[in-house]
Curated annotation (Swiss-Prot):
InterPro entries in the cross-refs: Urease_beta-like, Urease_betasu_sf, Urease_subunit
GO molecular function, one term: urease activity
Keywords associated with the record: Cytoplasm, Hydrolase
Record gene name: ureB
HAMAP family, sorted: Urease_beta
Subunit structure as annotated in this protein's UniProt entry: Heterotrimer of UreA (gamma), UreB (beta) and UreC (alpha) subunits. Three heterotrimers associate to form the active enzyme.
Protein name: Urease subunit beta
Organism field: Thioalkalivibrio sulfidiphilus (strain HL-EbGR7)
Length: 112
């Protein structure tokens, strides 16, 4: 092995393989572009984005880590959202949650 060399497995890598994406239609009602990163809690995105915000509680974009989706002014597009995993605790963003999220429909209850 050469220092810094990557040894990658053959084949495709499936993102979020164990999570089912849910489609959401989103409209930018503002006058400026809005960009949302891969792990931003979608429930708490810019208020100029119009969508079923309550249904997006505990969800994030179903896109590769480190990437983003851009919504131009007046643009409507459909995005896929997946549940946060792990401890499902959300802090920061717009401060709407600041703690544990409700249990995802496809997740067992956390005990601790």
């Amino acid at each position: 092995m050469i220092p810094g060399e990557f040894l990658l497995a053959d084949g495709e890598i499936e993102l979020n393989a164990d999570r089912e994406g849910r489609p959401f239609q989103v409209t930018n009602t503002g006058d400026r572009p809005i960009q949302v990163g891969s792990h931003y809690h979608f429930h708490e995105v810019n208020n100029a984005l119009d969508f079923d915000r309550d249904a997006a509680l505990g969800l994030r974009l179903d896109i590769p880590a480190g990437t983003a989706v851009r919504f131009e002014p007046g643009q409507t597009r459909t995005v896929s959202l997946v549940p946060f995993a792990g401890e499902r605790r959300v802090y920061g963003f717009q401060g709407r949650v600041m703690g544990p999220l409700p249990t995802a429909p496809d997740e067992p209850e956390q005990t601790s």
